[in-house]
Structures are given as structure tokens and as C-alpha cells.
A protein has these predicted regions:
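Extended, hydrophobic/aromatic-rich amphipathic alpha-helical segments that build helical scaffolds
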Residues: 4-19, 41-54, 118-130, 148-156, ...
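Active-site acid/base region of carbohydrate-active enzymes
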Residues: 39-100, 134-175
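Acidic, Ser/Thr-rich low-complexity linear motifs
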Residues: 165-176, 217-224, 268-277, 326
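Alpha-solenoid helical repeat scaffolds
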Residues: 17, 21, 54-57, 131-138, ...
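Acidic, glycine-anchored loop motifs typical of Ca2+
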Residues: 29-40
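Conserved, well-structured interaction surfaces
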Residues: 13-23, 107, 111
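Aromatic (Trp/Tyr) and acidic
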Residues: 1-6, 64-120, 124, 170, ...
Length: 344
């Protein structure tokens, strides 16, 4: 849920901001036939359906299925040798979001709550409620998402703090240790849906807690420490607040951008991210942050720097290789996304 909540919410927000950018070539199952729904929403609904499954009651939330016992080298998906105690290629464990340290062996997480998961899951559900209500005239699914958003947000308020990923025998995990940004995002989206002032006040309070906390001023960080690497909540809240608060929110974004601008001035490609594990995620995040900053303020002073980060990902790098499969067609790009299938 750490990653799926973010991926789902980001796809939904991208569609909401620019629906004209997304086409309809396949159906929900990926068959090459249009189904009247933009493909990005077909993909996002896989995330929503998964999130509904693991949040199957008002106070219920699972956050992880399986662990590093899956890390057994190259294997076919239908002949999985992973064994969780029920034999190979069988059942897997599911971890409930308790908000407390978890881990079945020596490498325990440092969890303190569940608000990171609950907050951004609430954001995803709130956006989905708007889209399925207004775009697809599906009040049943829209209400299901709205109810989930309200429930998840309340769960986050009751257990402020962060739930981390769990490992079994490996010393690494998803070390996310921030949560106020996620609750800000959830509160801002719910205010947009309900107009209830309590959500607006919550969002402003969480925004000031989240402030400028980010990877942007760090040269190193634990794996996934500042996930999801950008605070979308500042952007969503911006349109609902007074001039003074707008300046605060824009200032938070600007501070992070300035840190990366300084770092980028020290290399030929003007890349502003530290080259650590998941540095491409950071490049996407700071590019997105500058796009949202421009939308908020109209200030384009960082535009060329933003293009440099984007172009690095698209092939203007020492390898002349795109970091995306099948795009852009003019440069080399990865063609074997599933290493096991290619190897076997």
C-alpha cells in the first residue's frame, strides 16, 4: 500500500489536471479495444479495487502482502518457488496496519502510526469519488470511494505517524518516515469534496507540519525515506487558502527547488538530485514539483531547470538512454521490463 496508494492517487490527479492528454486504446484487462474509459483510469481502478480489498471495513487496513521471501532469483510467475510456510507457489502472508513496529525476524520496522498510508489512500479515494461521479455518472462506485476516503482519513487522524514496509530476512525495507504531507493531501481533497471547514483547517495544520521536509536538501537518505518524494498536498491546498497561506505553500516548494538548483549547478547535465537508490524517482518528483509550482504561482524562473530534469529521464544523459520503456522512439530505451522473463 505504501507504493500503490501513491501510484493510484498520482494517476487520478494527473487525469483530473489534464484529461485531454489521455487516450482510450485498451479495456480494463488490457485488451486492445476501447471501453469508453481513458486507459489511465483503467489502470488506476486496478489500484482502487486493490485498496478497497485491503480496507474492507471502517477500521481495517492491510498494508503489505508478501515480503523479501519472494526474492529468490529468476522465476516464472506461475511457477513461483517462494514458500511462506504453505509450500512453494502457494499462500503469502498479509500484514495488518497496526501502526507499530513489525517484522517476523531481526529486522523490525520503526513504525509509529498509519497516517502516511491512510492520508494518501484517502486522497486517492476522494479524487476517484469526484471522477466517477462527475465523469462516468456512477454514483454507486463514487459513493463507495467517498466512504472509504472518509474512513481512511479518520483512521489516519487516530493513528498519526508512519507505517513502514516489512522485511523478513533482509536488512532493507521501505523506510518512509513522513506522514503530515499525506494527511494534508487527504484533508485538502476531502475539503474539495465536502466543503467542510474542518478538513480545510486540518490541511493547513498538516501543511505547516510538513513544511519543507524533503530529500531535496540531503545528499543521502535511507531507501524510500521521504516517499513519495513530493508533497502534492501543498498544491491541492493552494487554491483553497488566503494570500498569506498561498505564499507559505509556494515558499515550501521554492525552498526545495532552490536546493536542487544549487546541486545541479555542479554538473554538466544540471541534474539536481542526489545519485542514490531511486534517483530517477527523485528526478520525476522535482520535475513534478516545478510543474505544480508554475501552476500555483505563474512563476517560470525554474522552467529551463525543470526541462533539464525531464530531458535526463528521456535520454539526455551519459548513456543516451531513456528511463522509460518504448518512449521516446528517437532514442534507446529499455525493452525488457520483466528481467526474469527475458532471462529465462
Amino acid at each position: 500500500l505504501i507504493t500503490s496508494s501513491n501510484a493510484t492517487a498520482r494517476m487520478l490527479k494527473a487525469y483530473e489536471l489534464a484529461p485531454e492528454k489521455f487516450g482510450d486504446k485498451v479495456d480494463y484487462l488490457g485488451h486492445e479495444r476501447p471501453n469508453g474509459i481513458p486507459d489511465v483510469l483503467d489502470e488506476a481502478k486496478w489500484g482502487l479495487d486493490w485498496m478497497h480489498k485491503i480496507h474492507y471495513g471502517p477500521d481495517m487496513l492491510f498494508h503489505q502482502v508478501a515480503d523479501d521471501r519472494d526474492h529468490l532469483g529468476m522465476k516464472w510467475p506461475d511457477k513461483d518457488s517462494s514458500d511462506y510456510g504453505w509450500g512453494a507457489n502457494s499462500y503469502r502472508v498479509a500484514y495488518f496496519a497496526t501502526g507499530e513496529p513489525q517484522g517476523l525476524r531481526e529486522y523490525k520496522s520503526k513504525a509509529t502510526g498509519i497516517a502516511n498510508l491512510a492520508g494518501r489512500s484517502a486522497a486517492a479515494m476522494a479524487i476517484a469519488a469526484r471522477i466517477w461521479k462527475n465523469e462516468f455518472n456512477d454514483p454507486v462506485f463514487a459513493q463507495k470511494c467517498e466512504n472509504a476516503a472518509l474512513e481512511l482519513y479518520e483512521m489516519g487522524k487516530r493513528q498519526e505517524g508512519y507505517q513502514q514496509g516489512n522485511s523478513y530476512g533482509a536488512p532493507y525495507r521501505y523506510n518512509e518516515d513522513t506522514w503530515a504531507d499525506d494527511m494534508e493531501w487527504g484533508a485538502a481533497e476531502l475539503y474539495k469534496n465536502t466543503g467542510e471547514s474542518g478538513y480545510l483547517e486540518d490541511a493547513k495544520r498538516y501543511a505547516r507540519m510538513a513544511n519543507t521536509v524533503s530529500w531535496t536538501d540531503k545528499e543521502d537518505a535511507e531507501h524510500y525515506r521521504y516517499y513519495p518524494f513530493i508533497n502534492v498536498g501543498h498544491f491541492v491546498l493552494y487554491e483553497h487558502v488566503d494570500r498569506e497561506t498561498k505564499e507559505e505553500l509556494a515558499g515550501y516548494y521554492r525552498a526545495g527547488i532552490e536546493h536542487t538548483l544549487e546541486r545541479g549547478s555542479k554538473n554538466a547535465f544540471k541534474i539536481g538530485v542526489p545519485f542514490i537508490w531511486c534517483s530517477n524517482n527523485l528526478a520525476v518528483a522535482i520535475t513534478t514539483q516545478m510543474i505544480l509550482y508554475e501552476k500555483m504561482t505563474g512563476d517560470t524562473q525554474y522552467h529551463d531547470f525543470m526541462l533539464a530534469q525531464r530531458d535526463w529521464l528521456l535520454g539526455r544523459n551519459p548513456w543516451v538512454t531513456s528511463m522509460f520503456m518504448n518512449f521516446p522512439v528517437e532514442v534507446e530505451y529499455p525493452q525488457d521490463g520483466q528481467t526474469s522473463v527475458w532471462y529465462l
